[in-house]
């Protein structure tokens, strides 16, 4: 969608931003970063360089999801470093089967699926909790199974029973926390909090663990409210900010791209999100983030009737296009947690 080229120099301040503040997008630096996308036409995770606008031809790296109903509509992918399985891509798919979608860890070096599980909801986002080996999914709704509904909506944690092990492969062994419309999850390694976004809320959770350090649940410690469906949640790799998107059009006053920060107040012994400020007054943005050099990149849908685009937008230069592609989300490939 080319309307972003008309908006690159325009910033709409949020209701919580300082009155009269105005920002103009800075030109991108020349640093060459790698971008990972989920592409639903081929149903692949693909890697490209942000140094080129032509993304046609074979991707620099790609992985094709199996041709089964639970693997349809890849929805998220994030590159993470593990101690026992090297660099992996944690990924999820909405799925179309009555049993739901999928979550998985795919090893980068040989593209082997080292772990996977069916998630009865429609997984929109996935994360790995560093230091615990747990996989987290966010599902916007439950998925029908036969004549009943399984509790697949919300936040679901697949937690290894021992340190260094793989998570369970059965959803029955996962830990579930309700969150209507859950669309995004992110492990905040600086604050050691799990962040999640869904209908009308951005939440922060602390991990609840047993005496052996194994996760047994989540404790909600902070909430930021807004109107609409929170869609994506990403770090700002150029600052300590958290970036999130809220869906909708002009009928929703809180649509667009927002930033905030999570902080702990030792005086009150409480966690809180900073007052948010709106970066851009955009509609239907599916993902948005900033690279370490400040370059912004995003995927937006042409309208409310669809959810993909053949284009990934970048600040300071022309967009990157792959003819016939259906990009749903774009991520910074090179981010790893130690």
Q: Locations of the language-model features?
A:
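Short, solvent-exposed loop/turn segments at conserved positions within beta-propeller repeat blades
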Residues: 96-100, 142-153, 253
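Repeated scaffold domains used in trafficking and secretory/extracellular systems
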Residues: 70-81, 121-128, 180-184, 227-235, ...
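Short loop/turn segments immediately following the C-termini of beta-strands
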Residues: 40, 93-95, 139-142, 199, ...
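Short loop/turn segments immediately following beta-strands, especially the blade-tip
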Residues: 52-53, 160-165, 206-214, 262-268
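Residue-level detector of Asp-centered blade-edge/turn motifs that repeat once per structural unit
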Residues: 83-84, 130-131, 189-190, 237-239
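Surface loop/turn motifs at the tips and blade-to-blade linkers of beta-strand repeat domains
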Residues: 64-69, 116-119, 175-179, 223-227
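N-terminal export signals
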Residues: 5-26
